[in-house]
Amino acid sequence: GGHGPLWDLAEDAHSIALIEAFNNSGKPIGAVCHAPAVFRHTRHNGEPLVKGRAVTGFTNGEEDGVQLTDIVPFLVEDMLKANGGVYEKGDDWASHVVTDGNLVTGQNPASSEAGAKALLKLLA
């Protein structure tokens, strides 16, 4: 999480390859807050990995709330929608976690505990 993934994780070929390999082998994938930025370039069968999947991540409203909308290279909510994700969100700053198959995403830092529990459930 944190804003860093918008610049590094989203563009790192090794991170992208790792997420794609996990997905292709059915392993659980978890991303909370800004970490869903890694789904910017990840693919599955030539399509965005999140296409048609229920996902969440830091909302445009939350980004506006921290006054970084005009600084970040892209908005997580907009990117997930543009990549065909079925974006869901809860109230700003409240815990909200979405699980779709092997993919667990959390909206913001308040979602960390619930996101970890959802990921552990997939590992059980």
Predicted regions span which residues?
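Active-site-adjacent pocket-lining segments in enzyme domains
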Residues: 1-124
